[in-house]
Structures are given as structure tokens and as C-alpha cells.
Amino acid sequence: EGLICLSGCLAGEVAQKLTGDDYAGAKETALRYRTLFGAENYFLEIQNHQIRDELRNLPQLIRLSRETGIPLAATNDAHYITKEDAKMQSRREDAAMQEVLLCIQTGKSLDDPEHMHFETNEFYLKSTAEMAALFADVPEAVTNTAKIAERCHVEFQTGKIWLPKFTMDGVSDCR
């Protein structure tokens, strides 16, 4: 109760099925999540970072929404504050740190040729106007994202670093 669920990015279950050419499986999965979270709490997440698989999945997600009545929500992975920061990421000193953090997040090694990296410079915090332009064919997706934000009651204290608290009982060596 009180949870809102989005289908996720390319790594999400629905998108993975679409990427694998399993439209029926994607539809079945989406309907299962809608049943689990409720029709008013489950959204098909659409993104457009100019990545091939996202562009390929986008029309399928729109079709899936129209066939099932599951609403769309337009989102953007924001790893940088501005477009300029995103463009500079490959030249910045902290680019290596960003790559290391992505490897930690995805459980990959820098030596793994399949480790995650940003294919485009679109991973920045986009304005409402930019999102509306990206999703001009489905304006309801941007509207739904705003409605989701209005339903969330979160206050962030800026200027303070928030780290999770956890214990490592029984661990004596972190290597």
C-alpha cells in the first residue's frame, strides 16, 4: 500500500523481454505488476537517451500501454546536473570514478568488456520542456510523471551526505 512502481529502464524486466523480442512475455509481466501494485500505481517507464535499444523499445512500450491501459511515465536517468556536465564527463578527472561506480552498481569489473558505460551524453537532469519535446508523441507520459511526483511526499536536506547504515557481522577482511 502506498507504493508506486515503474517498469524500469532497459535493465527492467519488461524492457528486457522487449529487447529479447518477447512482446507477449513483456505484456504478461506488465499485467502481473499492474495486478500486484494496482492500476493506479503501476506505470510503463519510457526513456529516450538516444540508445538503440531504448529507441527500438519505445514504440513497443507505447503499444503495450494502449493495449493494456497501463499508463506511461517519461523518465530520464540523471547522472549529471547539466547537459554541459554530461558532455564533459568523458574529459573530466572524475570520469574514471563514475565508471568505477557504475561497475560497482552493476557488479562488473572494469576489465569486463560488457561493463556498463554511458553511450550518449543524455544522462543529465532534463527540464520539463526538454522532456516534453522528447516525448511529443505521448504527452500524457510527461503529465503522468508530474502526477507521480505530486503524489510523493519527500523532503531532502541538501548539503548533507546520506550514507546507509549497515553492519558487517562476521566479516574481518573486506577484500
Regions found by a protein language model. Give the residues of each.
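Phosphodiester-processing cores and adjacent nucleic acid-binding clamps
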Residues: 1-175
